[in-house]
Amino acid sequence: MTLGDPCSVEQPPPPPIDFSRSLIAPTAIKQESHLIPSTPGTPTAFQPPQHANTPIPGIQPNLFNPAIMAAQLNVFSNPQLMAMMQATRNPLLGHPSVVGPPMMPNIIQQLNALRNVQLSNANTMANLQNMSSSPKHTNGSSERSENCGELCVVCGDKASGRHYGAVSCEGCKGFFKRSIRKRIGYVCRSQKDCPVTKFHRNRCQYCRLRKCLSMGMRSESVQAERRPVNNSSMLCNNDNNQQNTTPEHLSPNLLLSLVKLEHETKLGGLEALIKPGSPVMLQNTQDYMDVKRESIGEDEMTVIGLVPPSASPTSSGVGSSSSISDDSGPIYTSERARFEISVPLNTQNPRNHQYISEITTRLLFLTVHFVKDSRVSLRTSTMEGLLKSKWCDLYILALMQTADKIKLGQLLDNLTNQMAMGMECGQYSAEKFEKISEQMQRLLQLSQLFASRELTAVEYAYLKMISFTAQDLPSSMASPETRSVNQMASQELFEYVSSSKSTQNHMSNEHINVDDSTSEDNDTHVTSQQSSVNIAAERFSRILQLLPCLRWFDPATIVEIFFSGLIGPMSIETIIPFVLQMNLMSFFDQKMELGSGGASDTLSTSSLSEMMNNQ
C-alpha cells in the first residue's frame, strides 16, 4: 500500500497480549493478525483466514494454551518462542485446508522436548539436594545408634551386641550366663548398692547380677540356650571327646544331663515314656526285665552289668510272682542296709553351688539304686510305678539319713539365700518363695525329729521299704506282691528292733531300775523278757510314727528346691525309667565307697562312657 491509496488508514498500535486468559477473544485474534507481515493474495501459515473464529469440529480450543505453557517454561523473555507459541495457538494450522508446511507438530514436539528437559533438570537438582542432605541425616542417626550400642548398659564397657535381651559387653554376658546356668548364689557384703562399673564390676557379684536383671537381661534366654538343637550330633561329639575329658572338667549335673539326653534319644522323647503301650517302651522294658541285679551285700566289688543273668543267685523270670528271693535270711542285714554317699572332696563347702548339685544328683541315683538292688524281687513295671509315686518319700528319707554327712542345715540356708535373691530379681513370686521357705523349715524340723530317734542303717532301710510299698496314696498300686513285701518288712523290722543292742541298752538304762529290796518280791518283779517286748513295741511304734511326716512335703516343691536347675522342664517321673535301666553299680562301686582312700571327688570319665555304651 502507498500513502495515496484511499483505502490506507493509519492503524493504531496493537494492545499488549494478555496471556492470562485461556481463550482469546475474536477481537484479539483480529489484532494479532497485524503482528505478522503479509502480502495481498499470498496466504501464509501465520495469517489466519477470515473464518478463524469458526469452531472446527473435533478441535478442542483448550488443547494448547500458550499462556500456561509460557508460565511453566518461563519463556516470557524470549520473543521468538512467544511468536511460535502464539502461532500454534491457532487451531487451523493443523487443518487440511490450510496451505503451508505442517509446522504445528514440529513446534509442539520441540516445546514438549524443551519442557521435558527442564522438568528433568529440575528433578535432577531436587535429587541432588536430597542426596546431599540425606547422608548427613543417615550418618547422624547411625552414629547415634552406634553410640547407643557402644556402651554396656550394666558396667559401661564397650558393648559387643545385644545379649539375652540387653546391650552388654562380653564380660557381663559371660557372667550372666554362668550365674544363671549354674544357679550361683551371691551375697552382698555391703548395703546391696555397690557400684557396677567397668573397673569395679568384679567386686560385688551380687549387685552385678542384680543390675543385669534390672537392665533387661532375661534368664529364660539362658535356659533356652541350654537345650541341645540336635541330640544325635551331641552324642557323636560326646563319644569323640570322652577320651580327652578329665574328671575335673565334668559339670556337677552331668549325670542328670546324660539321663535327659539318653531319654530323648534312645526312647524317642517324652512320648515314648508317657505312653506305656508304645512299642519302643515295651521293647526296652522287655530287654531289662530278664536281668535281676545282685544284692548289695553279696558282692559289692562286682559290676552287675558284667554278670550274666544266669549267674545271679537271686535272678527270677519275668513271670515270677515271688516277692522275696529264694535265698534265706531277712531282707536287710547290716551289710545290705548300707547307704553311704561320698562327698565331693574339692567342693565340700555347702555354700558352693557345685556341692549342692553334686549332692542332690548322687543322692537321687543312690536312692533308686538302693531300692532296685534290694532282696525284694518286684516286677519291673511294679517297681517303676512305685518309684514314680514314692520317689519323694524315699528322697526325704535319704536326706534325713545323710543329714549330718551332707550338712543339710547349711545346705538349706544357702538355698534359702539363693531363692531370696531370685525373688528380689523377679525370678520367684512372694507366694512361691513363702511356700519354698515353709518346705525348707519342715525339712529342718523333720531332721531334728529323726535325729532324736537315733535310727540305725537297718531301721532306715526297713522304713524305706515300708514306705515304698505302703498303699497310703490315691495313686498307689495295690497288688498282692506289694502287700506281701510290706507285711514282711514290718515283721522283720519288729524282730530287728526286739533283738537289737540299742533296744537292750535303752531297756537297761531306763526301765531296769529296780531296787534290790523289791527284787525279792515276786509281785512287783518285772522280768527282762516282758520289759524287752514292751520297749521293742514302743520303739517300733515311734519309728512307724515317722512315716506320716512324709506327707508334709509337696513333690513339686521338692523338685523346685533341689532339681529345677538340673533337669529343666523334665519331671522326676520321666527320668526314673532311665535310672532303673542304667547300670548304676559302676557309679557306686569303688568310686563312691566311704572311707576308701581312692574315692574320687567326681564321677570318672570311664564310668560315664560305660553308662552310655551299656545302654
Curated annotation (Swiss-Prot):
Cellular component GO terms, alphabetical: nucleus
Gene Ontology MF term list: nuclear receptor activity; RNA polymerase II cis-regulatory region sequence-specific DNA binding; zinc ion binding
PROSITE patterns (UniProt xref): NR_LBD, NUCLEAR_REC_DBD_1, NUCLEAR_REC_DBD_2
Pfam family, one: zf-C4
Record has Transferase as a keyword: no
Record bears the keyword Nucleotidyltransferase: no
SUPFAM superfamilies documented for this protein: Glucocorticoid receptor-like (DNA-binding domain), Nuclear receptor ligand-binding domain
Tissues expressing this chain: Seam cells, excretory cell, rectal epithelia, chemosensory neurons, gut, head/tail hypodermis.
UniProt-listed GO biological process terms: cell differentiation; regulation of transcription by RNA polymerase II
DNA-binding residue intervals: 149-224
Domain of life: Eukaryota
Alphabetically ordered keywords of this record: DNA-binding, Metal-binding, Nucleus, Receptor, Transcription, Transcription regulation, Zinc, Zinc-finger
InterPro entries membership: NHR-like_dom_sf, NR2C1/2-like_DBD, Nucl_hrmn_rcpt_lig-bd, Nuclear_hormone_rcpt_NR2, Znf_hrmn_rcpt, Znf_NHR/GATA
Region Disordered: start-end pairs: 310-329
Annotated NR LBD domain residues: 323-583
Compartment list: Nucleus
Start and end residues, zinc fingers (NR C4-type): 152-172, 188-212
Record's function text: Orphan nuclear receptor that may have a role in dauer formation.
Family: Belongs to the nuclear hormone receptor family.
Protein name (record): Nuclear hormone receptor family member nhr-41
Organism: Caenorhabditis elegans
Name of the gene this protein is made from: nhr-41
